[in-house]
Amino acid sequence: MLIPSKLSRPVRLDHTVVRERLLAKLSGANNFRLALITSPAGYGKTTLISQWAAGKNDIGWYSLDEGDNQQERFASYLIAAVQQATNGHCAICETMAQKRQYASLTSLFAQLFIELAEWHSPLYLVIDDYHLITNPVIHESMRFFIRHQPENLTLVVLSRNLPQLGIANLRVRDQLLEIGSQQLAFTHQEAKQFFDCRLSSPIEAAESSRICDDVSGWATALQLIALSARQNTHSAHKSARRLAGINASHLSDYLVDEVLDNVDLATRHFLLKSAILRSMNDALINRVTGEENGQMRLEEIERQGLFLQRMDDTGEWFCYHPLFGNFLRQRCQWELAAELPEIHRAAAESWMAQGFPSEAIHHALAAGDALMLRDILLNHAWSLFNHSELSLLEESLKALPWDSLLENPQLVLLQAWLMQSQHRYGEVNTLLARAEHEIKDIREGTMHAEFNALRAQVAINDGNPDEAERLAKLALEELPPGWFYSRIVATSVLGEVLHCKGELTRSLALMQQTEQMARQHDVWHYALWSLIQQSEILFAQGFLQTAWETQEKAFQLINEQHLEQLPMHEFLVRIRAQLLWAWARLDEAEASARSGIEVLSSYQPQQQLQCLAMLIQCSLARGDLDNARSQLNRLENLLGNGKYHSDWISNANKVRVIYWQMTGDKAAAANWLRHTAKPEFANNHFLQGQWRNIARAQILLGEFEPAEIVLEELNENARSLRLMSDLNRNLLLLNQLYWQAGRKSDAQRVLLDALKLANRTGFISHFVIEGEAMAQQLRQLIQLNTLPELEQHRAQRILREINQHHRHKFAHFDENFVERLLNHPEVPELIRTSPLTQREWQVLGLIYSGYSNEQIAGELEVAATTIKTHIRNLYQKLGVAHRQAAVQHAQKLLKMMGYGV
């Protein structure tokens, strides 16, 4: 729950001076991105902005305290303030903030600005006491906020110091409205108005001016002088002389003498006790001070001018002026040290009664009451965990003695889940092992089963499927039906283990069961995870259309539950990119991969490895080797600076080896082959992928025999495990092996098998990536006119894609190539004596690439009759009579120049 007072603009009090000159300056605030009000404590920053905000509707107010350095808490309150200003316009952001379903503050703000794009009225967001923020992540996020906020939004920041918000840049660009302490200082006229409304006996204008000069227009000093004069302890001028030249850091002695020592003991204790509350209402005051009629007492304190502020229009919530509140808290520690723990306990109990466990924890920690802290955690810790209050929980658990954790194993489990969420896998097992060693009878029953479910999740995350399977099975055997969260975890882990083992049918059933349980109990991140796993399994089985439909369900879940910022969203868009790539929808595949990188923009660059590999695949499928090389440089740098799952390494190696194949880089392939991992098995898609990488490198190096052994074994495993997509890929690579080894009939046989299987998988780009060798074979099959209709159609589609993206031979017949060809000692004499024109060389290249006359005309943007003339001329010069002879002649020329065709 959010504390309402933190989102309430302070009420404009009676007897305050209206700062007309400053309000006039603020009237143009909507013309600036940032309005910055800075001064030391007590200069009237909050009072000024509350005057300016009076009557404005499209304004949100966020009052900070020290606890707002937690990113999640900061995000929740800031979005709530925007919702307040827009009357609930940004519903998606609100849900994301409440459920902590965002990757970072910047990504949450990016979503906020998308929603605010439809809000066209002027909008204001006030953040008070920004000097309390010390978290550099929040500073950086707010700099992002200011850079990208909509033009109709003005951010108003109140701070005691200059905040780290890129102020200089805003100032240069005239996007900053500044009001500092010199402007906030009271003028002679304002000081006179102030005393006139505060004192029963007016003072002369000259006296008022001297007092104002003595304290340099400091509003707090003027307030103290008025308070002192009302209490008749000193004359106003005498108080002013005493305050002259001091500042907020030297006020303590003055406040003791002039405030605390001039109230009765009951009021003094009321002030000291109530000051431990960052915000207060009637119920909190009653419990903390022991006085009834807390609301009346607060209103009385307010009337006495003792630096108390109303925080909302209803008058329910109050707080002390920060300067006075800090002073009172310090005095409370000195004067009521013995009572202080009990006061904090009372505050914690009252906050709990009002449904604010995080505030209660703050006071339980301050009281040093481990028993109270334990009880709060036992009742509310999992709710706080699910709302990502991780820093607060970690601090709380550290404050509990180990014996208290042992007496309450649920708290040990919570601490272990905290470690797991931070990827501290080794510490999880150490903690649980220690607990099991010291807790009697823990090795049996429900708690042990919950430990095992968590251990299973850690084991699968850490790449240990056998141990994960053992632990997940134990957990499911021991967990009661009602322990749904741990049952979801264990079922998901078991499904993932079976996926790794290639038992796809059983794995799919368990992941469907996980989805059903997770949806039933609103455990949305596991529901999303199970859908992603289902899609991967269906892809591996060759059911790409069903995989697509499962992905659609996952995207719908993300939209409904606002899970866009979860890292798992990247996993989903990445496997969507893989599917689109397989179907040769390259532009969409690239866009999907780039959106995955955007999801991970606030994470370590190493997390982007998979999406980067997907972008390289798109470049390779287009034949764009320059772009692929540029991206590969970055990929190889990431590989050298991180630890990755074998699936990630396999995908990264795949694009590297394909690139070496396309560029003929045998040295790189040989070096990689010497050092790369040789998996013991090949019973899942990523192990199959790594062995396929090895076979491709062996083929490039001419090591046909070992490559054939690898591929035949892969095919045997793929058939037995029904890894149909892997079988399709393996057949294509085996085709390349046979083609290059001169075993043309074997090459044709496996190519026909691959085309037939592609009717199920829908593969296109996997054929295209093999380039001209594949194009030649497909041209021959099409010319034979013996393919079934579906295979014939697919072969024509693949050939069109190769012709579009892999015009290697057309590229070879450029001016530089022709010049080198004509100077080659073995060039046919006929070409030397009767050379082709540059246009005729281009036409020959397109004929060789499989283009029809109409396609050549379209490519070169000339009439079809012109192309016929060019063809007739080049046939005559080459001494050939038909198209196939021209193709064979071009092939001989390319071989002569050293191109493997």
Swiss-Prot record:
Domain HTH luxR-type positions: 829-894
SMART domains registered for this protein in UniProt: HTH_LUXR (SM00421)
CDD domains: LuxR_C_like
Documented activity regulation: Activated by ATP and maltotriose, which are both required for DNA binding.
InterPro entries found in the cross-reference section: P-loop_NTPase, Sig_transdc_resp-reg_C-effctor, TPR-like_helical_dom_sf, TPR_MalT, Tscrpt_reg_HTH_MalT, Tscrpt_reg_LuxR_C, WH-like_DNA-bd_sf
GO annotation, biological process: positive regulation of carbohydrate metabolic process; positive regulation of DNA-templated transcription
Pfam families assigned: GerE, TPR_MalT
Superkingdom in the source lineage: Bacteria
Residues in the DNA-binding region annotation: 853-872
Signal peptide annotation: none
Keyword terms, alphabetized: Activator, ATP-binding, Carbohydrate metabolism, DNA-binding, Nucleotide-binding, Transcription, Transcription regulation
Amino acids binding ATP: 39-46
An annotated Gene Ontology molecular function: ATP binding
Subunit structure: Monomer in solution. Oligomerizes to an active state in the presence of the positive effectors ATP and maltotriose.
Family, similarity comment: Belongs to the MalT family.
Role of this protein: Positively regulates the transcription of the maltose regulon whose gene products are responsible for uptake and catabolism of malto-oligosaccharides. Specifically binds to the promoter region of its target genes, recognizing a short DNA motif called the MalT box.
Name assigned to this protein: HTH-type transcriptional regulator MalT
Protein encoded by which gene: malT
